[in-house]
Amino acid sequence: MSLADLIRQIPVLEAAGGSTTSLPVSMISSDSRDVLPGALFIAVRGYSADGHRFIKSAVERGAAAVLCEEIPPVLPDASLPYLRVEDARQALALAARQFYGFASDALHVIGVTGTNGKTTTARLITAMLNACGIRTGYIGTNLCTFGEQQIPLDRTTPEAHILHALFRRMLDSGCSVAVMEVSSHALVLQRVYGITFHAAVFTNLSMEHLDFHKTMQEYAGAKRQLFEQLSPQGFAVINSDDPRAEEMVSKINPEKRFCCTLDQTGRVAGDASRRFSAELIDQSIASATIRLCFPDAQQTISTVLPGQYNVMNLLQAAAVGCGMGLGSPVVAAALDALPGVAGRMERIMDRRRKEFVFVDYAHTPDALFKALSTLNALKSPASRLIVVFGCGGNRDRLKRPEMGRIAVENADLVILTSDNPRDEDPEMIIDEIEKGIRVKNHKRITDRAQAIRTAVALLQPGDVLLVAGKGHEQYQETAGEKSFFSDQETLRNALAEENAGEPEKGAVCKGC
C-alpha cells in the first residue's frame, strides 16, 4: 500500500523531508525494535516512554516514513517523509485500519469491558458462539485465538496495529465474529479508536488501576467510551445490578439494552422483552446448577464455574447469544456443554487427595473477596480456607492493604507472596499488603513456589486452597525479566511431592 493511500483519512499538519506520493509501505509499527525495511514508523507517546526518542533508531532499521507529533529538528535521513499530526495514537489506529483493509468493519466485533469478569465472559461468549456454528475469534488477556490458532499477546488489548492485523487474520480464516476484552487503558490510549462495535458488554466496576486513572469517576468515564463506539444497529449487555450500570448506558436507546440481573430488579430501566435474570439452584465445590430466565423462556444449565459472580458471567454470555439472534434453547445447550475457563476458579485435580485446590486470576479487592466468599460458602464448617496471593509491582498501590484486609477477614490462613513484582522490591510490596492486616493469621513467603508448596503441605483433608492472582499466566516478572512460572504446574508438583509420587496421569476435570 502506498503511503499516500495510507494517510488519506489522517489530517497531516506539516510535512518535511521526501515525497509521499508513491512511496510503498510494507508494515506499520509503533515500536522501533520491530521496524523492518519499508515500515511506517508512528512515534507514540507511551505511558513510560516517548516514541519520538526512537525515530532515529527506526530510520536506521529501515523505516520508509515517519509519522509523529513533533518533527525532529534534525532529520535522521532527509530523503524520507516526516509527517506531523495532532494525535499520533489516533493516526496509528486509522492507519492500521486502512492498512489491513478495514477488516474490523467486516466482522461483528463484540467488546467486553469491566473491572472483573472480562476474560470469563469473553471466553464464554466465544466458546458459545463457536459451539453454535458461528466462527468466532477471541482477543483478550495475553492471548488471541481463532480456529486452531493461539497467538500470545503481551496485554489485554493490543496496540492498534497489532489489533487490526489480528482482525485481518481472523477474517481470512473464516471468522465472522471477533470477541475482545477492552481494557480501560486501551480506551484512553485509543487502541480501539475507529472500531465500531456490534455489541458492548459491561461486567462491573470496582477499585482498580487508580495509579493510571486517579479517580473512580475517571475510571468509569474510560469504560463508558466503549458504549460511545457502539453501532446504531448494535446492542449493549449490562450488569444492571452494578451501581455504575446506568452511567455506562445513559446514552444508549433503551430498546438496545439487554439488562442482566441476579437480584430480580436491577438498577437500570429496561423493557421486559430484553431483561435476563438467573437463579443459582444448587452448587457444590465442584459444580453448580443455574436457572437462566430469558425474556421468552426458562432454561436450566450446569457449570463447573462456582459463585454468584460466575452466574452473572454466564447470564451476560446468554444475553449476547440472544442479541446475536440465537434462540434460548440453543444458547442454553451451548453454555451447558462448555468447560471452565483456564485460570478462573480452575480446580487442580488429584484424586489421591481429599482437599480442594483452585487457581484464580483474582487480583483486585472485589475479585479476591468474591472468590474467597464463594469458597467459604461451599466448604464444610470444619474445614479451613487457605489463600496464597500477592500484589503486582508497578501497579495500583492503593489496593494492597485493602486486599490484605480482605484476605485475613475471609480466610483461615493467608500466605503473602510475590506476584510479578516487576521493578519493585517484593518485600516492600508485602509490607504494604500487611498494612491492612490487623490479625496474625498470615505468613509471608516471598518465593511464590515455596509459598505454594508450604500451603499444600499444610492442607488437611477437606481443606480448601486458593492460589490467587496469576490465573492463566505462565510467567513471573521480576526486575524487568520474565521467567516461566505456572501456579497450576507448581501445585501439581507440590501435590505429587506430598503424595511421595509423580503427578497422577489423566486426573482432569471438566473445568481444567
Curated annotation (Swiss-Prot):
- Record localization: Cytoplasm
Query: Which InterPro entries would you find in this protein's record?
Result: Mur-like_cat_sf, Mur_ligase_C, Mur_ligase_C_dom_sf, Mur_ligase_cen, Mur_ligase_N, MurE/MurF_N, UDP-N-AcMur-Glu-dNH2Pim_ligase
Where it mainly occurs, coarsely classed, is: cytoplasm
Q: Which cofactor does it need?
A: Mg(2+)
Which stretch carries the motif Meso-diaminopimelate recognition motif? 419-422
Statement: the UniProt record of this protein carries the keyword Lipoprotein: no
Assigned EC number? 6.3.2.13
- GO CC annotation, single: cytoplasm
Q: Where does meso-2,6-diaminopimelate bind?
A: R395, D419, N420, P421, R422, G469, E473
Q: Where does ATP bind?
A: G114, T115, N116, G117, K118, T119, T120
Among the GO biological process terms of this entry, one is: peptidoglycan biosynthetic process
The UniProt record lists the keyword Ion transport: no
Q: Name one GO molecular function term.
A: UDP-N-acetylmuramoylalanyl-D-glutamate-2,6-diaminopimelate ligase activity
For the modification N6-carboxylysine, which residues carry it? K223
Describe the processing and modification events after translation. Carboxylation is probably crucial for Mg(2+) binding and, consequently, for the gamma-phosphate positioning of ATP.
Binding of UDP-N-acetyl-alpha-D-muramoyl-L-alanyl-D-glutamate, residues: S32, T156, T157, S183, R191
Quote the catalytic activity from the record: UDP-N-acetyl-alpha-D-muramoyl-L-alanyl-D-glutamate + meso-2,6-diaminopimelate + ATP = UDP-N-acetyl-alpha-D-muramoyl-L-alanyl-gamma-D-glutamyl-meso-2,6-diaminopimelate + ADP + phosphate + H(+)
Name the keywords, alphabetized. ATP-binding, Cell cycle, Cell division, Cell shape, Cell wall biogenesis/degradation, Cytoplasm, Ligase, Magnesium, Nucleotide-binding, Peptidoglycan synthesis
Which pathway is it part of?
Answer: Cell wall biogenesis; peptidoglycan biosynthesis
Q: Which cysteines are joined by disulfide bonds?
A: none
Matching entries from HAMAP family are given as: MurE
Summarizing the function annotation, the protein's role is: Catalyzes the addition of meso-diaminopimelic acid to the nucleotide precursor UDP-N-acetylmuramoyl-L-alanyl-D-glutamate (UMAG) in the biosynthesis of bacterial cell-wall peptidoglycan.
* Family indicated by similarity: Belongs to the MurCDEF family. MurE subfamily.
Under PANTHER family, the record lists: MUR LIGASE FAMILY MEMBER, UDP-N-ACETYLMURAMOYL-L-ALANYL-D-GLUTAMATE--2,6-DIAMINOPIMELATE LIGASE MURE HOMOLOG, CHLOROPLASTIC
What's the protein name? Answer: UDP-N-acetylmuramoyl-L-alanyl-D-glutamate--2,6-diaminopimelate ligase
State the taxonomy lineage.
Bacteria, Pseudomonadati, Chlorobiota, Chlorobiia, Chlorobiales
The gene it comes from is murE
